[in-house]
């Protein structure tokens, strides 16, 4: 290649120069960097903010010739050191800098990784894309890579180049759509974005890195180059135990938590991840929770979205600290015997212009047609699960959380909206699949791939589906035609139970089926029984405020609700604040009302929750056969007039507990309950206990069998059944 000073008008060099100076150069290495020349090598650099540039050669620093007033410099000769170093001076400011030329370095991404990425099978795309601190030919710097197949030009911009898209244009890997650039000598923690020019419209977009692992604190949204901090994990024992964990038969009691509103400093500041660990872990242990589930902590711009509109699928939100601080939080949870589950949102993403939306000027991560790609309820875009690179992106996001942060499970949000093309859409607002149906075939394939990957790559890790329809086999293996989730939230149980509990007790006998219907389908899936954040927002009222009656009855009903939940078949999840008996809905901008614990009724709710949790954890009959019909049997589900139900929960060794629940405010003395043998019984739990601020009606001492058959059982006992309360009984000799 000839130097610009000797090129003829209209030459390719003139064209490349024009494209560079107007930020339209598709292939920067065709113009910048090292090229063959008659006298050895031609080095060409673009430094628009420098007055003079020298090239380090075997003969020392040699001045480069200015060939364009906008900052193009050339040097031609022999003895070039590789990779070559530049010394640059801005004579106006007196600033002198030394750094290597990015265009002296080859691209590093392998063709194999690009192939897998384009095939939708690269499970660790976060190693390929994004910003990475690497060494290239002995020089330390940052390698940037981004997928933008419809771009004419992509540049890395930041404070380090005055956000000038002409300075660091990236190089593209053939037809893969992946752009790459190694910038040597770039400091750790530098803020950056990608400037993208669409090749059709010429639109210029400024986008944050979809694969970044750290972003600026909101409201800013630039990505940060990685800071080398290798975390020293100390949870080897936990991970080893998890691999062999028999979760089907184990207790699983989840505390659902929003990091920013559990507790705050007196001045309203968030707890950091370290501070959260200091306060939360002892609380979880004391209260008897086995796991904590965090509402989404991937980076998101809006507090009020609760994290469900993510813009950083590989980044812990900077609101509460660094990635290393979150690793420490998870590590400390594991060392304390607490598992950590994350809410993860592959169903949709926000319209924010700095993020995924129309990333390269086209519908890249979403569908072009809003009938497929836009969610009217949430004002968000829907991922295009049929696009392989989007599949690699989402699978890699899940892999990253489980690998980098040792997460124990993912709760997948809004699964129903993924499965149905006509979800929350009217006629004419959706497009059928290739068979004319309403099933989203690509989303089904993605979910199966996700679950297969999680269970295969991370033994013992769990996946939970928040799926609100009757879609079959959600928690059955993908190889058997299911979606492959470990468990599914039982939204039917939740809706029926809360509907029943909100009826005035005098009318509950007309809605008795809302208590009993669940047993018709309770074992068709591996169910979790949720009393989640979604039920205490948007005018639905707090759990306490949902309950009918006067003040005492509200608390009694709430105690009864929690007793029913903890004794029903299925794993458990409760949202933070439920255990306090909060009087108003969850407010994301405030901490929980901890001051309520100064009052007896609220202390009673917390004490009941604590005792129920520990009873559940330590009683095999209450958890071993949650997913199996042999773990439950009715004693009496027909006492409609008195709104009482009774049932047994069974363990694998044949032991059992007897549960009797009274959903009316009537104290029932002399209430007869059928029993399966002739043992005496004793009360092991009573939600009406004085310790829970109840009326303290109950059953002291042994309860002897009467010898009278009852409710299809060979014998029976007579008990006192407290008002709006539940009792749990065990055989006195068991």
Curated annotation (Swiss-Prot):
Origin: domain of life: Bacteria
Keywords, sorted A to Z: Carbohydrate metabolism, Glycogen biosynthesis, Glycogen metabolism, Glycosyltransferase, Transferase
Active site: 413, 466
Annotated catalysed reactions: Transfers a segment of a (1->4)-alpha-D-glucan chain to a primary hydroxy group in a similar glucan chain
GO cellular component labels: cytosol
Record carries keyword Transferase: yes
Example of a GO MF term: cation binding
Pathway participation: Glycan biosynthesis; glycogen biosynthesis
EC id: 2.4.1.18
Gene Ontology terms: biological process: glycogen biosynthetic process
Assigned protein family: Belongs to the glycosyl hydrolase 13 family. GlgB subfamily.
Known role: Catalyzes the formation of the alpha-1,6-glucosidic linkages in glycogen by scission of a 1,4-alpha-linked oligosaccharide from growing alpha-1,4-glucan chains and the subsequent attachment of the oligosaccharide to the alpha-1,6 position.
Quaternary structure, from the entry: Monomer.
Protein name, UniProt field: 1,4-alpha-glucan branching enzyme GlgB
Species the sequence originates in: Nitrosomonas europaea (strain ATCC 19718 / CIP 103999 / KCTC 2705 / NBRC 14298)
Source taxonomy: Bacteria, Pseudomonadati, Pseudomonadota, Betaproteobacteria, Nitrosomonadales
């Amino acid at each position: 290649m000839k130097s610009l000073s000797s090129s003829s008008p209209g030459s390719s060099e003139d064209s490349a120069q024009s494209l560079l100076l107007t930020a339209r150069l598709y292939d920067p290495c065709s113009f910048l960097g090292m090229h063959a020349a008659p006298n050895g090598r031609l080095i060409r650099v673009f430094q628009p903010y420098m007055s003079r540039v020298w090239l380090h050669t075997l003969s020392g620093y040699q001045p480069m010739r200015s060939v364009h007033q906008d900052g193009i410099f050339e040097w031609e000769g022999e003895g070039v050191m590789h990779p070559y170093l530049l010394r640059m001076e801005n004579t106006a400011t007196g600033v002198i800098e030394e750094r290597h030329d990015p265009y002296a370095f080859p691209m590093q991404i392998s063709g194999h990784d690009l192939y897998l990425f384009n095939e939708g099978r690269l499970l660790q795309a976060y190693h390929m894309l994004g910003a990475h601190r690497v060494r290239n030919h002995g020089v330390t710097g940052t390698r940037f890579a981004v997928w933008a197949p419809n771009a004419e030009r992509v540049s890395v911009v930041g404070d380090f180049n005055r956000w000038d898209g002409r300075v660091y244009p990236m190089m593209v890997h053939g037809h893969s759509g992946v752009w790459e650039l190694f910038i040597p000598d770039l400091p750790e923690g530098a803020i950056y974005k990608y400037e993208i020019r669409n090749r059709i419209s010429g639109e210029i977009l400024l986008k944050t890195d979809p694969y970044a692992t750290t972003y600026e604190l909101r409201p800013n949204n630039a990505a940060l180059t990685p800071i080398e901090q290798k975390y020293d994990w100390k949870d080897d024992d936990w991970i080893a135990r998890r691999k062999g964990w028999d979760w089907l038969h184990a207790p699983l009691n989840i505390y659902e938590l929003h990091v920013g509103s559990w507790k705050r400093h007196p001045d309203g500041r968030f707890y950091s991840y370290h501070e959260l660990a200091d306060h939360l872990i002892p609380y979880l242990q004391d209260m008897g929770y086995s796991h904590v589930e965090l509402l989404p902590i991937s980076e998101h711009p809006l507090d009020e979205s609760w994290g469900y509109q993510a813009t950083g699928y590989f980044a812990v939100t900077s609101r509460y600290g660094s990635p290393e601080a979150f690793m420490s939080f998870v590590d400390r949870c594991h060392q304390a015997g607490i598992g950590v589950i994350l809410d993860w949102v592959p169903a949709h993403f926000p319209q924010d212009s700095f993020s995924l939306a129309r990333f390269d000027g086209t519908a890249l991560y979403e569908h072009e047609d809003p009938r497929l790609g836009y969610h009217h309820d949430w004002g968000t875009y829907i991922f295009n699960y049929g696009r392989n690179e989007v599949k690699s992106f989402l699978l890699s996001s899940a892999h990253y959380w489980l690998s980098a942060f040792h997460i124990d499970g993912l709760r997948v949000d809004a699964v129903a909206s993924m499965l149905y093309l006509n979800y929350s859409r009217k006629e004419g607002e959706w497009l059928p699949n290739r068979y004319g149906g309403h099933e989203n075939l690509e989303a089904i394939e993605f979910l199966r791939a996700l679950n297969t990957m999680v269970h295969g790559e991370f033994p013992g890790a769990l996946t939970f589906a928040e799926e609100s329809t009757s879609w079959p086999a959600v928690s059955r293996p993908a190889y058997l035609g299911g979606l492959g989730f470990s468990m599914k939230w039982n939204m039917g149980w939740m809706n029926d139970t809360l509907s029943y509990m909100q009826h005035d007790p005098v009318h509950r006998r007309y809605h008795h089926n809302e208590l009993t219907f669940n047993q018709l389908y309770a074992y068709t899936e591996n169910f979790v029984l949720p009393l989640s954040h979604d039920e205490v927002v948007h005018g639905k009222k707090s759990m306490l405020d949902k309950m009918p009656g006067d003040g005492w009855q509200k608390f009694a009903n709430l105690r009864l609700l929690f007793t029913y939940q903890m004794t029903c078949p299925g794993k458990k999840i409760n949202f933070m604040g439920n255990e306090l008996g909060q009087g108003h809905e969850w407010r994301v901008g405030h901490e929980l009302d901890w001051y309520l614990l100064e009052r007896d009724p609220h202390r009673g709710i917390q004490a009941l929750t604590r005792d129920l949790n520990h009873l559940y954890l330590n009683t095999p009959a209450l958890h071993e056969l949650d997913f199996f019909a042999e773990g439950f049997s009715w004693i009496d589900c027909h006492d409609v007039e008195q709104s009482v139900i009774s049932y047994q929960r069974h363990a694998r060794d044949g032991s059992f507990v007897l549960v009797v629940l009274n959903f009316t405010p009537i104290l029932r003395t002399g209430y007869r309950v059928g029993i399966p043998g002739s043992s005496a019984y004793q009360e092991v739990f009573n939600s009406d206990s004085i310790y829970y601020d109840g009326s303290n009606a109950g059953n002291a001492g042994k309860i002897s069998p009467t010898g009278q058959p009852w409710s299809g059982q060979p014998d029976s006992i007579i008990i006192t059944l407290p008002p709006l309360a539940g009792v749990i009984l065990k055989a006195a000799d068991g």
